[in-house]
Every structure is written in C-alpha cells, then in structure tokens.
Amino acid sequence: QRSLVGSEMCIRDRNISVLFLWAMSAIAFDSPGKVSPKVINEEVWAAYDGFNSTFLDPGKCIYKTDSSFESAVDRHNGAAAIWCQPIYWDMAMNAYKLAEAQKDKARKKTMKALCDDIFAGNKAHYANFDFDDNNENTGWFIYDDIMWWTITLARAYELFGDREYLKLSEVSFARVWYGSDKVGDSGSYDKENGGMFWQWQPIRNPAPNKFGDGKMACINFPTVVAALTLYNNVPERRKQSSESTPKYQTKAQYLEKGREIYAWGVENLMDKKTGRIADSRHGNGSPAWKAHVYNQASFIGASVLLYKATGEKSYLDNAILAADYTFNTMSSEQKILPFERGIEQGIYTAIFAQYIAMLVYDCGQTQYIPYLERTINCGWANRDQTRNVCSGEYDKPLQPGMVVDSYSASGIPALMLLFPIF
C-alpha cells in the first residue's frame, strides 16, 4: 500500500484511536453547563436500527423521504432524493466498518448484506446506473447528483473490492466531466475558465454552459473528493486512454484534476481569512457567501485528501480553518451543529460527519471531538424514544410519532457510527 504522506500528523490505527479520542472528549467537556448523559455502544446500534426501521423501504432497499410514507415509490411519492441515497449507503458502510472493528461477526455479516442490498436497490431504481438517462423521476439530470454517487461508489470499491463499483464510479466521473453524447450537454468542467458548472439546461436538448452560469461549491469540492478517492484506488501503472472523452483516468490525471478544481475553488469560493465556503459563484460576480455545512464538509474532505496525497501543509491548514469556522461561527453557542430547514438540507450533518472524521482520524485533529460529542449527546437525548429516531433540531425533543424526514434524522446516527464509544 502507498505510504501515508505527513504521517507525523496522522493516527494510523483508527480502531485503537477511537477510545482514546472519546476519553479525551469526556475530559474536555467536564465544564459548567448541562451536559447530556453519554451515549453508550448499544445506543449507537439502536440509533442506526431505528433509522433503518423508520426510513428504509424493505422491499426496494432505498430510503424514504419521511416517516409518513409506507414505501419509496419514486421521486414524487416517497423516495428520498437521488443525491442523498449514497449518503445513506455511506452510513451502512460505516456501520459495517464499526461492526468489524468491534469484532462482531454476526452484525458485520448483517451490515454487509445491508450494503449489498442498498446498492442493488438503488441500481434497480435509478435507471440501472445509466448516467446518460436524464429522465426527471428516476434518472440523472444535475451534475452534483451524479458526483455524490461517484464518491460513494469509489468508497465502496475501496472497502469491498467489487470492480463493478469502481467501473461505475469512473464512468460517472467521466460523464460529469465531459458531458454525454446521448443527453447533449457539454459537461460540467469549464475548460476555458476553470471550475465545474452545476447543471445543464434545458434538461432535454441542453445548450452549452456559458460564462456566467453557476458554479456551485456542491459540485466543485465533491469533484475533488471523487478525483482523489479514485486516485487512491486505481492501478499505479494504468495507461492513459487515447479517447477524446475517456471513460477512465490514470492516477496522475485524477490527482491533476483534483488539484486544479480545488485551486479554482479556493480562489473563487473560499474566504481565506475565515474558512467560510461560498455556496456559488456566477462569472465574475461576487460569490454567494451563504455558508452551508455540507459545503464546509466537502471542502474539508477535499483538503484532507489532497494533504494526504501530497504532504502539502497548506491543504491541512485550509481543512482546519474550514472546520473552525463551522464550529465557531456556524454552530450554536454550545458548539452544536446547526440545522437548516430547506428541502433536503437536513442531510448536511451526515455529510459533515463523513469528512470531519477524516480530519480527526487521518490528521490527528482531536480538538473537534468534544463538539461532536456535544451534538451527539444533545440530539440523542431529544430523540423519539419509541422509534429511536432523532430530528435535525438537536436541542428540541422529537415528539413520539411526529413525522420526520430521513434527511434530518440521519445526522445523529451518522455521527454516532463514526464517533462511537466501544
């Protein structure tokens, strides 16, 4: 395996480090003010089981929009958003890794079956992962919807070694970067001015993207995460494709693409003094400086992956700056992660969990553990105890039986799976 760059900053054995980090967090929050009782290991699994019992359609093995639906029929009738489904698959893979770390063979087997079922269910529902199918119900019609899947498919390959996952991840990356002959779009990548466009329009018979069209953080930094995750997993000596729109890249090409898009993002979407990430920029206009947790998250993940690949400390510094902004400016006075009420925005904490874990575990930034623990304990204490389901407003009780969406409910179990006590 590739040697870890910057290893003096890294915690190599994640399984050993978890207990130490949580012990340190207990000391850090032995301070004035009310602190909820600590979550124990059994509750981690109760939270994840409660989430799945409430939101996973057992027949289709995809997730529902909210608890009011009996099943996940389609986009307009009970199925959670296409771009959020891979975040739920990430949670299942994290559950598998946790069971493995705990040497719980029975639960590990169950979680592996769940991971397989979620992939199969989503493949069946979403056009057999034909990324050139742009129907607006079960197809692909926004660039970032595809790229979130690119990332998780690459992670699934990294964990399980199934080559179908890698093939789909690379094909989807290429589809976003270069566009689709079938759909007729020109691709997300702006070869003239850099960065990634968010969408093609119209969805049917699209016109080429032009200067001034939106370049959102939610496509740019996930593109970096995808490129670097693929960089970590494709063969070392792969030959460069001779096709004008190749279906795969070499390791060097993935790294180059990741570095290029990241550099564009830093120049156009990052406040270098504070670590705030803008939501978007259109042409030479001022960035839209509304900060969202998932944009902070994907920027942190992109920064960590580039730091590990190159050893360049500026990437790590950027990740820390963005994390500090999330906790010190965006979060509550108690450093509890914020909740946003927009459509699907409840998923932001689950995305943040994935990437702050990389900063904590891979780069030894343990200072964030107490704040994550505070969010977990607060959210779990306010759960609906009949279903073991949490809401996204972590400091407010969720009443028994109240309708709650899967996006908002995902945050606490996602954090618990990555920051458990065992």
Regions found by a protein language model. Give the residues of each.
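Sec-dependent signal peptide recognition
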Residues: 12-22
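Noncatalytic carbohydrate-binding groove/subsite architecture in carbohydrate-active enzymes
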Residues: 221-222, 226-290, 297, 302-305, ...
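Bacterial Sec-dependent signal peptides at the C-terminal "C-region" and cleavage site
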Residues: 23-34
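CBM-like carbohydrate-recognition segments
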Residues: 33-144, 159, 179, 186-187, ...
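Single conserved hydrophobic/aromatic residue that forms the stacking wall/gate
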Residues: 1-13
